[in-house]
Amino acid sequence: MRSHYCGDVNKSHVGQEVTLVGWVNRSRDLGGVVFLDMRDREGIVQVVYDPDLPEVFEVASSLRSEFCVQIKGLVRARPDSQVNADMRTGEIEILGLELTVLNSSAPLPINMDKNQHNTEEQRLKYRYLDLRRPEMADRIVFRSKVTSAVRRFLDGNGFLDIETPILTKATPEGARDYLVPSRTYKGQFFALPQSPQLFKQLLMMSGFDRYYQIVKCFRDEDLRADRQPEFTQIDIETSFMTSEQVMAKTEEMTRGLFKELLDVDLGEFPRMTFAEAMRRYGSDKPDLRNPLELIDIADLVKEVEFAVFNGPANDPEGRVAVLSIPGGAKLSRKQLDEYAKYVTIYGAKGLAWMKVNDLDKGMEGIQSPVLKFLTEDVVKALLERTGAQTGDVILFGADKANVVAEAMGALRLKAGEDFDLLKGDWKPLWVVDFPMFERTSDGGLHAMHHPFTAPSNMTPAELEANPTAAISDAYDMVLNGCELGGGSVRIHNSEMQSAVFRILGINDEEANEKFGFLLEALRYGTPPHAGLAFGLDRIIMLMTGASSIRDVMAFPKTTTAACPLTNAPGFANPVQLVELGVSVIEPEVKDGE
């Protein structure tokens, strides 16, 4: 039905007759000539109909937005004065010779013009229309190019594309599982996989030493702009490769993607330990485009007569750190109060500040509500350490170390945006040497990555004796403050795996019930293995500049995990529930509802 895609017609086709199919993007009647902007997934081209062909002209005059049409016409160059540099096809137009309406369109329920606003609910309810818009179509096409490039790279490096089960067993991986009741085994449930983690490890044990899969994963968790209940991973696992080799190979793949699809040279990725990232940036996924860093000053304020500072400064678990913001002295009191309110979201109790109005005037050039608690020597040392200059502001965080890191790290990002401090387009890095475990709110321990991550250079006995000192052989790839992917060397013997389970409060009986198949498999010559999983949706979001992963998925869910298009989730047929042996507990209706 077509000879070319609309967006592919160019100056090389001048003088040729082409056949196109697509949708009417816009139609204009200017002085007895109909200009038709015709659109398909590859772009838009202008088709011109004049009255010399009365029957065709009459049909062209009747067209409305989103009519589905087929046209035949002659490609001709536009006059220089009419060239549209903003269009891929802007050097040419098509003189329409034939026109067939393949289907008409009812009045549209959403605005198709990119400059017109639609609500998120409208866009998802009429997603098939939303996806016709060029900016959305471009992202879906780009996504396909990314997955094709990933497959080419991995296939070319000896990786095998192997599918793993979707109906599997519930295992504790940090989020709630989506459960699927079994009709055959009444009262028992499958779980949709949060990741293929255990199956890809089992594939390593099976001898398939290089595996990959572009795979759907499912997590029943609270959603944010970069989270969906079902999402896609580029999942990779290898045997007989060290963490350094896995990082080198996946970095090569990532650099290749950016070069091929964006013509961007990312260069070699720097390394940073988890401890350094938290100390300097308050985040384990720092955005290195932002030049601001957290600066520790606990040693300077241990003796000051101000409990807000000296308390955390003398607490082994406390921290006092500052941000020095160039040009920040122009912040009004109201703006500073807004910053103080902002950090409370992250557990901070408030925010002290100090403006450097005139460095040459000494203490007289300093303005701060806490200045009365600070000696001239302390202020001088503070200015020297931060490098603050006239016109800058210093913001203080003082609390438990984890609160200071989270609150000041978030404030660092906000200030970087507010003061337009971000430099460069792309800043990748590897974050390494993560703690093996971290404390839970009730004082217990949980795995920072997952319970199958191996420690660096520790025996099972050493690990159980001092688990909080353990460093995992794990690595995260970070780009512009977003975690693109994370991975680790895996545990490959049953003694170490059992030790980790015990540290996490999983006794031997529970471990055998939930992970007996894994512990058994680890007994039969399991090779050393390691891997990494990328969040495909997040990669596409970053590469296309989209504001949400919903804008790079064909049919995403809302932030409440619903689908307005199909009205999912929905109620099950009572007959099906009986067959499954499932009864539904109706929510309680409160008085007045």
Curated annotation (Swiss-Prot):
ATP binds at residues 219-221, 228, 483, 535-538. One of its GO terms (molecular function) is ATP binding. L-aspartate binds at residues 173, 219, 449, 490. InterPro entries: Aa-tRNA-synt_II, aa-tRNA-synth_II, aa-tRNA-synth_II/BPL/LPL, Asp-tRNA-ligase_1, Asp-tRNA-ligase_1_N, Asp/Asn-tRNA-synth_IIb, AspRS_core, GAD-like_sf. Its EC number is 6.1.1.12. PROSITE patterns: AA_TRNA_LIGASE_II. Gene3D superfamilies: Bira Bifunctional Protein, Domain 2, GAD-like domain, Nucleic acid-binding proteins. Residues 197-200 are annotated as: Aspartate. It is found in: Cytoplasm. Keywords: Aminoacyl-tRNA synthetase, ATP-binding, Cytoplasm, Ligase, Nucleotide-binding, Protein biosynthesis. Catalyzes the attachment of L-aspartate to tRNA(Asp) in a two-step reaction: L-aspartate is first activated by ATP to form Asp-AMP and then transferred to the acceptor end of tRNA(Asp). Belongs to the class-II aminoacyl-tRNA synthetase family. Type 1 subfamily. This is Aspartate--tRNA ligase. It comes from Shewanella piezotolerans (strain WP3 / JCM 13877). The gene is aspS.
